[in-house]
């Protein structure tokens, strides 16, 4: 029983390692940069942004008046 579990773990490790080192077809434009990773408790793009909570990086709170501001990209 323990041998089967060990072999399954080794096999899974090999599969995961080959996926990590293989060529990825990820488009760099689709990936998030470090500064775009959303913090907890921040507002995302298009949401109203009161003074009590910030917009997620790299968004800024902008609008025609204080009561009509939304999180937008600069």
UniProtKB/Swiss-Prot annotation:
GO MF, one annotated term: toxin activity
Pfam families documented for this protein: Toxin_7
Disulphide connectivity of cysteines: 42-56, 49-61, 55-71
Keyword set, alphabetical order: Disulfide bond, Ion channel impairing toxin, Knottin, Neurotoxin, Secreted, Signal, Toxin
Cleaved signal peptide residues: 1-20
GO CC terms in record: extracellular region
Keyword Signal part of the UniProt annotation: yes
Annotated tissue distribution: Expressed by the venom gland.
Location (main, coarse): secreted
Localization of this protein: Secreted
Removed propeptide positions: 21-40
Described purpose of this protein according to its UniProt entry: Putative ion channel inhibitor.
Family: Belongs to the neurotoxin 35 family.
Free-text note on domains in this protein's UniProt record: The presence of a 'disulfide through disulfide knot' structurally defines this protein as a knottin.
UniProt name for this protein: U12-theraphotoxin-Hs1a
